[in-house]
Amino acid sequence: MAAAAVAAAAAAAAAASLQVLEMESMETAAAGSAGLAAEVRGSGTVDFGPGPGISAMEASGGDPGPEAEDFECSSHCSELSWRQNEQRRQGLFCDITLCFGGAGGREFRAHRSVLAAATEYFTPLLSGQFSESRSGRVEMRKWSSEPGPEPDTVEAVIEYMYTGRIRVSTGSVHEVLELADRFLLIRLKEFCGEFLKKKLHLSNCVAIHSLAHMYTLSQLALKAADMIRRNFHKVIQDEEFYTLPFHLIRDWLSDLEITVDSEEVLFETVLKWVQRNAEERERYFEELFKLLRLSQMKPTYLTRHVKPERLVANNEVCVKLVADAVERHALRAENIQSGTCQHPTSHVSLLPRYGQNMDVIMVIGGVSEGGDYLSECVGYFVDEDRWVNLPHIHNHLDGHAVAVTESYVYVAGSMEPGFAKTVERYNPNLNTWEHVCSLMTRKHSFGLTEVKGKLYSIGGHGNFSPGFKDVTVYNPELDKWHNLESAPKILRDVKALAIEDRFVYIAARTPVDRDTEDGLKAVITCYDTETRQWQDVESLPLIDNYCFFQMSVVNSNFYQTASCCPKSYCLENEEAVRKIASQVSDEILESLPPEVLSIEGAAICYYKDDVFIIGGWKNSDDIDKQYRKEAYRYCAERKRWMLLPPMPQPRCRATACHVRIPYRYLHGTQRYPMPQNLMWQKDRIRQMQEIHRHALNMRRVPSSQIEC
């Protein structure tokens, strides 16, 4: 009633205003007629102004204005859509009902004209050809989850169809994507794909990849697939992987690029997937088993684990595949013994997957003949007993430290002043080097080891310093170093072992006030990274061959000038303390050629329980210095040392470490360019040498003239 009264009053006021305007117009017209009559009586002629089609402005010589203008209100559409949405909320003028079987059984009222204009999904549905158009009800059934989408999500998507606005979160994006796909809201669907791209992570890449396939988001599927492919060995540890349907499992096993640790792991993955729903999935086992590369499995594993497996033993095709693989291994072993071992076959099914992680002993930096710094990295490919080229580092490294983490290889420091603070890390998955935050001090010959995901830099010395006591820690997430409390004494030529992800055992040298050859004394100490306390001990814990070897040579010049890759052990510190001993057996040195221990500047590292000695030099005199390319391996299984194929070129003061690199970067012959910064520096050195040589020649000319 109040609204009607207000409307009547507004209409009366408008009518009164119109009456006043009409009276004023009539008075003006009467006055004009009287003036015109007087003018006619006075002159006998009348000037009617410009002729037809000529405006007053044109007659007076001015610019004519437009006869018509367009008006557009930019906010009108948004205000209109907002008002329509408000009407929908209030149930005004609604002529269609959306009924969701899920969503708590809720019904949502709307306007069919708006829905039909918003998406092609509703245009044919509400145009009269279907019963929904006549009944005014649209039943929405068959959702991905039993309850259906949440009511709040449905409301948000309907509001988007009215206003073009919506808020999507990680909790709602799946349902929004499903609704957008059902209602053919292409732009909203694309937005959900971009949103999921930003949220893609190792923990959700399997689920997002499945969503991308389900809703045909090709770009999102490619990005998620690439993440899964490069981290497949981690993805298969997630229980969500074992919920995937057969066709996706088959696709992944067919992929040559998946990163895996071994084919044995893939066999166990197939078994685990089948056993999750044996009644339904056993029929797929044979097809999946054919996709495994049995020739890449160890013979003992084939005979002890694969062959006795029930799913294999009860399938004739699988039994034959295992027998063929065992026979190939036997022929290969026979060829090796007879000395007729041929090059690895090129048949793709007999080679490792390109993404399979292979064991490599990586050699980094160092100095070669003539004092040339080496940026080239090389690797000893363990399975194929050969050396391969790896990417160049961007620094001149000499006396640097190395540490291996789960994802990277870090190198830091150098005797070369221009690179003494630099830190680089190698990513095996990408086969690339990248710079990270530099050290806080220029130094070399220090210890570098990982504890709980952080790198600890301990001791070292510089070109003009007797040594350092400093302890700094690097946080990879922040890409930043910060100082901790210093060690109680100077520590140089540091070698480190980490125990229990807390304690760092260190073998080093420290300056002493006594008459010795170099004024240094060997020390062994333990650093607690939690309490930051130091304690001297008698020896490194004698845990494995790597520890025994180091303690056997700890007082030798061979060990003190060598670099040693740090190693981490999972055993508790109490057990490690019990393995400390004052007397150490040198049995591990029995089969090592005696001349090896006279080498200086070698690189020492480990692989499982084996020990490697690589490169170095003989004779400290610069004139007679002999750079070495030999490499030795202590085989724990055979309990003896073996001479490996020589490195491509001799080098000393390098570092070495064990790293797992995908086969795609190891097969064939690789060539990598030298980094631009080192090429420029090399050219500059060459130019300086030419200038120096020219200057010497110029000096010789006058002196020869004087002598004449």
Curated annotation (Swiss-Prot):
Signal in keyword set: yes
Gene3D superfamilies per the UniProt record, alphabetical: 1.25.40.420, Kelch-type beta propeller, Potassium Channel Kv1.1, Chain A
Cross-referenced SMART domains: BACK, BTB, Kelch
Kelch repeats: 360-407, 408-453, 455-501, 503-556, 610-661
Signal peptide stretch: 1-15
Residue numbers spanned by region Disordered: 47-70
Key words, A-Z: Kelch repeat, Phosphoprotein, Repeat, Signal, Ubl conjugation pathway
Modified residues (Phosphoserine): 465
GO CC annotation terms, alphabetical: Cul3-RING ubiquitin ligase complex; cytoplasm; cytosol
Keyword Protease among UniProt keywords: no
BACK domain mapped to chain residues: 205-307
Superkingdom to which the source organism belongs: Eukaryota
GO molecular function annotations of the record: ubiquitin-like ligase-substrate adaptor activity
GO biological process, one term: proteasome-mediated ubiquitin-dependent protein catabolic process
Domain BTB: 94-170
Physiological role: Component of a cullin-RING-based BCR (BTB-CUL3-RBX1) E3 ubiquitin-protein ligase complex that mediates the ubiquitination of target proteins, leading most often to their proteasomal degradation.
Record text on subunit structure and interactions: Component of a cullin-RING-based BCR (BTB-CUL3-RBX1) E3 ubiquitin-protein ligase complex. Homodimer. Interacts with CUL3.
PANTHER family: KELCH-LIKE PROTEIN 32, LD33804P
Protein name (database record): Kelch-like protein 11
UniProt source species: Homo sapiens
Organism lineage: Eukaryota, Metazoa, Chordata, Craniata, Vertebrata
